[in-house]
Regions:
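DPxDG-like acidic metal-binding loop motif
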Residues: 21-55
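Stable alpha-helical structural segments in soluble proteins, enriched in small hydrophobic residues
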Residues: 2, 6-10, 45, 63, ...
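Phosphate-handling active-site elements
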Residues: 10-15, 43-53, 70, 184
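Acyltransferase
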Residues: 158-220
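Surface "functional belts" at beta-alpha junctions
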Residues: 49-166, 195, 200, 215-218
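N-terminal beta-alpha supersecondary unit
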Residues: 1-26
Length: 220
């Protein structure tokens, strides 16, 4: 995207920008870092406030759009992390608050392991409130890819590949509104990339010494 062209199309000047919202992941390394660096540079150049927002928490808003029954809908927000893994987070947004309650914190794991962890969290909720019917809605990139795995969830609701960031201007507005709500701004997060996966690069082991080898001597 040409940022200067987008600003011009909106009838604005760069100095009119007061706040910039940037996604901080979790996502793969290269694209995530490039986006954050661009946002930081633009904020520095314009003097705009810079706000970071993770990609998973706002997904509760998508579930709220079609959760019309009397069940307590929990959101399993996911994002494809490649290598048959998913970034994920389990949240409960049906508590009269704009900020969802985290039930399983943001992490990376294999789909089968995610199912076990989510089922364990739901069991704890049921033990505390046995008369409540809980439903887990799975939403985000990778949801349909692992649809057969989600079938083993004890309280499966809907499964959707939707994300707010796929919905054009409407989705971006919802994403930004979530990031700039009073509750979000009261708990600012560092504008740094969320990778979650451990780096592949490791420090190599030192070279082994050959037994009884004193090394080469320098000759004149």
């Amino acid at each position: 995207m040409n940022i200067a062209h987008a600003v011009e199309q909106a009838g604005l000047r760069p100095t009119d920008i007061e706040r910039i919202v940037v996604g901080i992941g979790p996502a793969p390394f290269t694209g995530l870092r490039a986006g954050i660096v661009a946002a930081k540079a633009l904020a520095f150049a314009t003097g705009a406030e810079l706000v970071g927002q993770d990609a998973l928490s706002p997904q509760t808003q998508l579930v709220d759009e079609y959760a019309s029954d009397d069940a307590c809908h929990l959101t399993l927000a996911i994002n494809d992390a490649r290598r048959r893994q998913l970034y994920f987070m389990l949240m409960d947004s049906a508590r009269g608050s704009a900020m969802p309650r985290t039930l399983v914190g943001m992490d990376i794991d294999y789909p089968q392991s995610i199912v076990r962890r989510v089922d364990a969290a739901v069991e704890l909720l049921r033990a505390d409130r046995p008369n409540v019917r809980y439903v887990v809605d799975v939403v985000g990139h990778g949801a349909s890819k692992y649809a057969m795995t989600w079938d083993s969830l004890a309280a499966l609701g809907s499964v959707s590949d939707d994300t707010l960031l796929d919905k054009g201007a409407y989705g971006l507005e919802r994403f930004a509104s979530f990031a700039t709500s009073d509750e979000s701004l009261a708990r600012p997060v560092p504008v740094e990339p969320l990778y979650l996966r451990r780096p592949d690069v490791s420090v190599p082991n030192p070279l082994k010494h050959v037994l009884n080898h004193a090394g080469a001597d320098k000759t004149e």
